[in-house]
């Protein structure tokens, strides 16, 4: 059964009531330092985590995905303190397992090349606002092949320690593609598939982001990858946002509301159904509609409602 997840927001009673009223099933926690305990000891406090889980349960909500403490440049460059970062991530994964949480993501510094892009606020139908990016001119330098291979070695070192813990604890490790997916980004294309080749454990899979991959090559790439990864049972959850343009076709892209871009969201859901995916779909980056504040609650309500309508239509097939 396909479910809908959204960001955790501020976890206030007001926010939790709103997402419950919208029919949301689960919450996703995207920040590696969000949970109590991370700042103090480097990893989440189990008791505090269980209290959050209990509060969400009182609204009929579950935790779908959490994020491990970040692995920063200290770890990627092999500098002092990097080993401690990995040890904290390993302990955090154990804590998430004890709390009975299903999916965890590990973030890695250096998986994107922000120096190659210029970000701006794009304006769309009626003036709603969203993220836009275009290739910077002139193009900045990117890491050398040797530096990129060194990045992969550090990634593999981290996963070689995290995967056995994931297997023991029952938590799935989900990797997100490089966003923005510039050429040669470590998780921007071929490198993304390399993860499951190197770590074939069934505890390893993808947080597949339709918007990010569309930025790389449009809707045909998204549908092909969903089929490829989905038939292998490697899609753990999905980010579903819509975009216009791509780096391949326009050297730029702009995020838009779900009905307002190049992707056909219903075709995406249909492909997910065909490959047997049964996890959560998160509308991901929410454009700001007139009157929206920091939590973009009106844009969120629109996105959740749109997804629920698509899922209702899908259920009739």
Which positions does each model-derived feature cover?
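Structural motif corresponding to the early beta-alpha repeats
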Residues: 31-156, 168, 212, 273
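N-terminal basic, low-complexity leaders that serve as flexible interaction/assembly modules and, when applicable
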Residues: 1-45
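Residues at the starts of beta-strands that form the adenosine-phosphate
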Residues: 3, 62, 172
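Short, internal active-site loops enriched in acidic
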Residues: 71, 109-113, 178-182, 287-288
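Active-site-proximal beta-alpha loop/turn segments in soluble metabolic enzymes
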Residues: 134-150, 173-184, 289-291
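Short, flexible loop/turn elements at secondary-structure junctions
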Residues: 8-10, 33, 110, 177-181, ...
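Histidine-acidic metal/acid-base catalytic patches
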Residues: 1-5, 16-23, 54-57, 74-78, ...
